[in-house]
């Protein structure tokens, strides 16, 4: 009988721990080319996008249906952005070499000393400068590096990138979305 109570208490303990981990975002949301996307990074991306959108539309009056539609689209776009960033970063080392991070850092160095950038990150995105760099600036700099490389080779970056997204191995651990030929769509 003592074994049963001990087992039951251990089971309850692990259940409570799992609930706290899940609420903190420690659950896998997607697997992209072998890289896990965690719930906390998705929620952070969504919160940043919602904060930015609120700043842009603070004077507009929207009804509840419009707000819900916008919220759904922001959530979809946030996950799609994370998937795109992972696919691009995954290809970067193979395509551009191991110096890609140093090139990104050198591009961003001149902006990182600007005090106004910290204010923009804080006021418009509700982020620290370091988080802003990691989530917004670095992926954008990588896209620019690729675009310049493709332009120099007289190729179209957008067509290549769409092909990379179509070829990416994306497994979603949510029934809310489906990844269809490189595009994240809402499940009907």
Predicted regions mapped to residue ranges:
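N-terminal targeting/tethering segments
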Residues: 21-130
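Hydrophobic membrane-insertion alpha-helices, especially the h-region
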Residues: 2-23
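Proteins with a high burden of low-complexity, intrinsically disordered sequence enriched in S/T/G/P/A and R
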Residues: 7-11, 63-67, 123, 187-188
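Weak global preference for isoleucine
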Residues: 10-12, 37, 70, 74, ...
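A C-terminal, polar beta->alpha supersecondary segment
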Residues: 27, 134-188
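Generic alpha-helical secondary structure signal
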Residues: 9, 46, 56-57, 115, ...
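Charged interaction scaffolds used for protein-protein
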Residues: 1-2, 157
């Amino acid at each position: 009988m003592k074994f049963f109570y001990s087992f039951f208490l251990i089971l309850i303990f692990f259940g409570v721990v799992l609930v706290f981990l899940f609420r903190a975002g420690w659950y896998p949301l997607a697997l992209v080319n072998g890289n896990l996307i965690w719930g906390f990074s998705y929620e952070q991306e969504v919160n940043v996008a919602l904060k930015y959108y609120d700043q842009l539309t603070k004077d507009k009056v929207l009804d509840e249906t419009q707000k819900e539609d916008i919220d759904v689209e922001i959530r979809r776009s946030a996950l799609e952005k994370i998937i795109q960033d992972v696919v691009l970063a995954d290809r970067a080392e193979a395509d551009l070499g191991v110096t890609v991070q140093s090139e990104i850092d050198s591009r961003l160095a001149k902006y990182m000393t600007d005090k106004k950038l910290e204010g923009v990150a804080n006021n418009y995105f509700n982020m620290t400068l370091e988080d802003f760099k990691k989530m917004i600036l670095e992926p954008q700099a990588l896209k620019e590096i690729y675009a310049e490389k493709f332009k120099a080779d007289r190729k179209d970056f957008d067509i290549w990138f769409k092909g990379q997204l179509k070829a990416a191995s994306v497994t979603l651990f949510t029934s809310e979305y489906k990844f269809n030929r490189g595009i994240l769509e809402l499940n009907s």
